[in-house]
UniProtKB/Swiss-Prot annotation:
Top EC class, one word: transferase
Protein's name according to its UniProt entry: Phosphoserine aminotransferase
Cofactor(s) the protein needs: pyridoxal 5'-phosphate
InterPro entries associated with the record: Aminotrans_V_dom, Pser_aminoTfrase, PyrdxlP-dep_Trfase, PyrdxlP-dep_Trfase_major, PyrdxlP-dep_Trfase_small
Major location (coarse): cytoplasm
SS bond partners: none
Organism: Campylobacter jejuni subsp. jejuni serotype O:2 (strain ATCC 700819 / NCTC 11168)
Classification via PANTHER family: PHOSPHOSERINE AMINOTRANSFERASE
Subcellular location: Cytoplasm
NCBIfam families: PRK05355.1 (NF003764), serC_1 (TIGR01364)
Signal sequence interval, chain numbering: none
Catalytic activity, EC: 2.6.1.52
Amino acid sequence: MRKINFSAGPSTLPLEILEQAQKELCDYQGRGYSIMEISHRTKVFEEVHFGAQEKAKKLYELNDDYEVLFLQGGASLQFAMIPMNLALNGVCEYANTGVWTKKAIKEAQILGVNVKTVASSEESNFDHIPRVEFSDNADYAYICSNNTIYGTQYQNYPKTKTPLIVDASSDFFSRKVDFSNIALFYGGVQKNAGISGLSCIFIRKDMLERSKNKQIPSMLNYLTHAENQSLFNTPPTFAIYMFNLEMDWLLNQGGLDKVHEKNSQKATMLYECIDLSNGFYKGHADKKDRSLMNVSFNIAKNKDLEPLFVKEAEEAGMIGLKGHRILGGIRASIYNALNLDQVKTLCEFMKEFQGKYA
């Protein structure tokens, strides 16, 4: 029997995708070989590669103003690639809402970029999304859409006149996005859209001009990958294959509007379980900024019970509920592939646990 996986990433995958990958693992579409065994230069793989890029653009309803790049190195490599490629001679502005924005700020500073932190919620342990106003003349404005550790999420992105950069790693493909002022939108795909080893970057084509005439190593230059259709070097072929299956699955769900509707239902159910517990459970994030993806909470009346909660949950068939080492507590990551019944199972367990130990 499969466990219910609440891991923050790599995370649970739709069972039908796993079964299709299993079916095709040794014999891809009856061809007598695995997708993992063939050259990335073959027509067979190119159909997967370019098909995945087109489906990703279709889900976000993007036109040809945007290039889709498949890169390696995780979202963490983007912390350096973004300032390396997109910083000019001005200020790069960041909103600091958690560990991942702190890491991004650090990488930009290492490169000698003029970084300005225009808003931060660090003083309250990142329990909310701070009000942010970016200037009109920065090289770019940078935010992290969703914060896996602290369970906060932008409900709407800031309106900016300067190019907006969005790290969407943990709410990738979970809702529709207004791209009107987004210059670069990126994430590792291993939470909501595939397996580890692949990052997907949507970059507005005019931003690629910034990479020209810069002394950047070829592998770290966005223009290199755009001009070579993300085939400059051997890409992570199996991760792209899995991403392609995920794109098909999301389209078959009815697109991102339907996916968002289901995600909202799951989150509402879980937050109600916390809020109606008479203080036994307490969420970390301010209610107005709660994440639909990552629900971080404590057993407020007795935090010593939290390891027992995780242990008994595992015995009941639920894994991945231990909170991040920085914040502690309990965290339920309820990404796209988790269904409503699985979240309901967690809520029922939470009520039973409260009944035993309150």
